[in-house]
Amino acid sequence: MSLDDLGLTDDPVEDGPTFEANARIKARFALEATGLPALADDSGLEVEALDGRPGVHTRRYAGPEATDADNNAKLLRELAGLPPERRSARYVCVLALARPGAPIVTRRGTCRGRIATEPRGSGGFGYDPIFEPADEPPGGRTFGLYSDEEKGRISHRARAARRMRPALEA
């Protein structure tokens, strides 16, 4: 069930410096708005050669109205000319679980890889067409070429969800 399903149209201000801070902000916001337990996600892409950028600005890296293609193009321009070993990146997901009267629980999942030199594939969203998981050779398949099932086994969100499961069952 989402906040939209409950008729809540306000969004929290995601001004935290980290994925964890923003996930906590969203979970606390949902808990306070509904009084119900809330599970929130904050995710993004970190590129080593860019000191972790785009990071918490992943969705709006090329500007507030930027499309996925705009964000991908900006990132590819910034990494132009770098060899595969300097294009290391990771997707990060932090899940935050907020329950009434309890501390917020967070779990982090990552998926390591590298940024391709050009987009390949149209599946997924965001940076998927330019993200090569670590198990792929340079020039191999990007997440844009993975099936939902394949991506679901190794994605940062899947890993965070597996780590959160015990807290959800408690």
Region spans (language model):
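Anionic-ligand binding patches
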Residues: 1-170
